[in-house]
């Protein structure tokens, strides 16, 4: 929820910021049926909102997060003035997703480590953290949980459900699981399923965690340690896939950390230093069990599987209008993966707009400032606002 006064240490809140925000914790006592056949009961979801829900409850937009993000989509966290929302350049007054017009909701998914119930939470059956006992969750499970959040707000239909990367998969799942509950589906830098190569990257990352001596079968909390070495390597692997070769060449090239080579196995190149820094930073704040869960959810997502692998048949049940966006240098989820979604929609004669943005920053481009990209998003949301009278 948005406050009006800046927190201590923040002298100036930008006029296009949603301001200082404090999340709310929603508790759900009714069991949630999971895709794996089990249930989870008495769980919490962290939720953050921006803007005002109109009387008709038609101006709500759900923003779904990617692997290491959370409910904190925009604004300044009340408990940490340096914590700016992960999509702050997209969401706010006068921004592409304009909170003067739309009521924006961010939900932290089950299994995460940012306040929603996950492996770090207390298992009511044991009184200890769930750890490895936390059930494997899927994109579909997250969407079902998000639908319960919508119910609490009295939202029958979202003006849009939007996400990038893994968030885009959730948006896509919304269009299939609750086709009548969203007017528009915005899928950015995403894919209808992971390729074998992407599953392989995830497996190497998970293996680095599982082989860390401090992992203790996922119950490292009881040992008061974290498998930081494995998590560090996992993040380094993932980070490489988020950047383009062009971007890495421009940022680092073959620049050395010292003036000359030292003929050692310590850090020699600037790119090595960068990756180690990113890995170290990630290992300090992220949870290894959560990393395992979320990467496995990525692997499992494949809406065409129930339709004999035919994405066109899978997409036949959609009712929303679509905006699909890809980036030329994204090799994690390359443009051809977005075009698969577009083709399936066109085959079903569904309304879809598609843009392939020429950007040098690889997969991470969906999070960065780019005038063409943001103008496109702004224009699409202007259209939605006109439809609903926002």
Swiss-Prot record:
Subcellular location: Cytoplasm
Keyword terms: Acyltransferase, Amino-acid biosynthesis, Cytoplasm, Methionine biosynthesis, Transferase
Catalytic activity: L-homoserine + succinyl-CoA = O-succinyl-L-homoserine + CoA
An annotated Gene Ontology molecular function: homoserine O-succinyltransferase activity
Matching Gene3D superfamilies: 1.10.1740.110, alpha/beta hydrolase (3.40.50.1820)
Primary site of residence: cytoplasm
HAMAP family found in the cross-reference section: MetX_acyltransf
NCBIfam families attached to this UniProt entry: homoserO_Ac_trn, PRK00175.1
Role, per record: Transfers a succinyl group from succinyl-CoA to L-homoserine, forming succinyl-L-homoserine.
Complex formation: Homodimer.
Name under which the protein is recorded: Homoserine O-succinyltransferase
UniProt source species: Cupriavidus metallidurans (strain ATCC 43123 / DSM 2839 / NBRC 102507 / CH34)
């Amino acid at each position: 929820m948005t406050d009006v006064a800046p927190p201590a240490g923040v002298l100036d809140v930008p006029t296009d910021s949603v301001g200082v925000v404090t999340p709310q914790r929603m508790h759900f006592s009714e069991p949630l049926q999971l895709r794996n056949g089990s249930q989870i009961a008495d769980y919490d979801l962290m939720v953050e909102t921006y803007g005002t829900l109109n009387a008709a409850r038609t101006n709500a937009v759900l923003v779904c997060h990617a692997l290491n993000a959370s409910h904190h989509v925009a604004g300044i966290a009340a408990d940490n003035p340096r914590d700016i929302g992960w999509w702050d350049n997209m969401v706010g007054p006068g921004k592409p997703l304009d909170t003067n017009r739309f009521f924006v909701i961010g939900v932290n998914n089950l299994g995460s480590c940012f306040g929603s119930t996950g492996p770090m939470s207390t298992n009511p059956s044991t009184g200890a953290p769930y750890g490895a006992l936390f059930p494997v969750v899927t994109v579909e499970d997250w969407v079902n949980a998000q639908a319960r959040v919508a119910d609490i707000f009295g939202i029958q239909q979202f003006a849009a459900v939007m996400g990038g990367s893994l968030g885009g998969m959730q948006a896509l799942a919304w269009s299939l699981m609750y086709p009548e509950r969203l007017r528009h589906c915005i899928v950015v830098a995403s894919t209808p399923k992971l390729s074998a190569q992407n599953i392989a990257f995830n497996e190497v990352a998970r293996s680095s965690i599982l082989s860390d001596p401090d992992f203790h079968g996922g119950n490292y909390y009881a040992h008061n340690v974290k498998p930081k070495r494995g998590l560090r390597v996992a993040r380094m692997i993932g980070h490489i896939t988020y950047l383009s070769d062009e971007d890495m060449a421009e940022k680092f090239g073959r620049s050395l950390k010292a003036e000359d080579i030292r003929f050692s196995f310590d850090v020699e190149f600037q790119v090595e230093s960068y990756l180690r820094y990113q890995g170290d930073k990630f290992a300090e704040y992220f949870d290894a069990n959560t990393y395992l869960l979320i990467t496995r959810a990525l692997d499992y997502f494949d809406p065409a599987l129930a339709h004999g692998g035919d994405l066109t048949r899978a997409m036949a049940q959609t009712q929303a209008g679509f905006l699909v966006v890809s980036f030329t240098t994204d090799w994690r989820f390359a443009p051809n993966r977005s075009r698969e979604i577009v083709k399936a929609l066109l085959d079903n004669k569904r309304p879809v707009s598609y843009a392939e943005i020429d950007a040098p920053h690889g997969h991470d481009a969906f999070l960065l400032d780019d005038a063409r990209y943001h103008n496109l998003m702004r224009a699409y949301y202007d259209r939605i606002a006109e439809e609903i009278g926002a």
